[in-house]
Amino acid sequence: MFKTYRKLFFCVIMANVCGLASFAQQAPPAATTNYNPAEAFAPLFYTQNGNEFRSASGAPGSKYWQNRVDYNITANLDDVKHTVSGTITITYKNNSPDKLPYLWLQLDQNTFKETSRGYAITPPRSRYGAQGEKFDGGYKIENISVSQKTAAVKFSSMVEDTRMQIRLEQPMAANGDVITIKMDYSYIVPVSGSDRTSHLTTKNGEVYAIAQWFPRMSVYDDILGWNTLPYWGGGEFYCEFGDINFAITTPANHIVVGSGELLNPQEVFTGEQLKRWNAAKLSDATVHIRTEAEVTDPKSRPAKDKLTWKFKITNARDAAWSSSKAFVLDAARINLPSGKKSLAVSAHPVESNGTDAYGRGVEYVKASIEHYSKTWFEYPYPMAVNVATSISGMEYPGIIFCGWKDKKENVWGVIDHEFGHTWFPMIVGSNERKFGWMDEGFNTFINVLSSEEFNNGEYKPRPTAWHNVGRSLGNPALENMMLMPDGMAERNIGYNLYSKPGWGLELLRNQIVGKERFDYAFKEYIKNWAYKHPTPIDFFRSMDNGTGEDLSWFWRGWFMNSWKVDQSITEVKPFMKEARLAGYTIKVNNLEKMPMPIILQIKLKSGKTETIKVPVDVWMKNTSWLVRYNTTEEIKEVILDPEKLIPDGNAQNNRWVSDGNNAVSAPNIDGLLGTYSSAAIPIKITLSKVDGALTAQVPGQPMLTLTFDSGNKYIFEEGGIEVEFTADKTGFTLSQGGGSYVFTKDK
């Protein structure tokens, strides 16, 4: 509206001056800005429509499908040679609408071969790889067979790096065909395998953390078909869901913990341990199944040579386990919202025991699982096992591996983080190898809420330093969070996969859409994609639809790019009504590419302080915005983002303070009223008083309201117009667009 008035009013003036109507539209010099509303709020963020597989609302479509795989594994642990050997039967069901002439399997242990791609690209001192260990790494696979309905199937196989291809003579049929693959395999457990699997020497024996321990099916989906990115260590996993039965044979003096339910506790515990195990299922307090004092007591284990521990986990994408004769073992009941129960378990060497370490492990596991279950989605597994070992922190369904030397808040932090991964990616099965931020970032976000609640804030995290975050944005050395984990510098993984996406969700929840709407949409996303495979676009659509907001501007600026945020206060000016101070206009500029809501704290002369919030929508078509604040009292100070809740990378322009000369006296405009003419322009301007305000009008044109600026000056801000009266109020000089014109009051 204001721009229309400016054009109509000054086309008349300037056309008479120079005959050039376009000259009338010159604007005052604008603050230098990198912000482009058309870029930030550009439409067509989604380049494809929803379909019957993945709906436009972000939920799975009516014909969404995914394949299924079940595993049956028997394995042996040799604690002298540090080897795992076993036999696996894979039952694979093709629910896709496609025929499958070949199948792809993941052979993650092959990354530790000296001939592997992972070995070749892993730099010295990396967290990944085998930490320089020289050993005969990788799988040794024998006796592969393929069958359908007990009949043998002709096939050939090929191993390429960390992948195996099974080439079928006859393709698997679409929509439900089932095939069975069986093989024997073995491998040497690395001392440190990409900080995800390992064996640790303690004073009472070796602690084995066994993961990536069996050939797994790759995912075939409606996005890429076969997902065959090799395993190099940085990118984690993308796995199909199904049931996993596994039996682990170890020396009898070992205790084994694993994913899912322990099916035969009566066969592997002593009588006293079984009694304690069952008691723990009914206890909210920690029950010591095997105490620190009992670890070195031979009577604390059955007097046998070998024992087989049997586990089953259902509707899971993976399984892991740990074995040691050095374990202290604790447990307690987990209470779930539905009334169901699970079991919190902590297995750790005596070096990690104590109330300042994993002696509180069960307490931490229980609290973490109960919090996430009531807040987001119920925990699905019968046990939740923490193992203290040489791995700094790694998650698997129903079991996690944590750093054995951690203490106090670090123990809570690693347990809570790794069990938070139950929801991302164990339940919501995103593709970690391509989009690591979809599990690490989401998990980092929910960890903050969990830690705030635990034990009345015992380990409450420090608030996010948003202005520090803002200074990091746009730094090209930090790369982009949408890169694949294996495609970014290792030093940037923490920032891009964990911190920045976590901050993004925190911003959305606290500053942009609000907690109630965010939480509802986020829970709907989890519920809709539980045990399925969402993409980033599915997530973005889910949040848009669930919150009722088009958040394309946010996904574009924060996730797809790393745009900077910089808002500034340009000026604070009073306005009058009925010849009295009626309020102020506060001009805020958006100087960088990322828009954000405006948060202003206004302090009045009396000491009264008020905070107002302006939605991000004001930036849809503006690079600056006038915030109108009604008050009859003088403003002493204005601060942008006073509590530092927005990632503004430049706080130097966020504060305006009165210089003491800004006291507003109500000018008497009665002496200014009348009709004015200019010798240079054959036009008349009539100044009138309307609702106490000074207005200007050219015959036949809309009326403009002039705002008092200072001294004898009035302005029309949007048009860049200044009207400065003579001291005797018999005339004024009108300035706009670099031109000045003298008007004199008619007699």
Where do the protein language model's features map onto the residues?
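Short, hydrophobic/aromatic-enriched beta-strand segments in well-ordered soluble domains
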Residues: 88-90, 94, 105-109, 177-191, ...
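Glycine/proline-rich low-complexity spacer/linker segments in large multi-domain proteins
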Residues: 115-129, 186-244, 265, 644-666
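Peripheral terminal and inter-domain segments
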Residues: 595, 604-608, 613-615, 622, ...
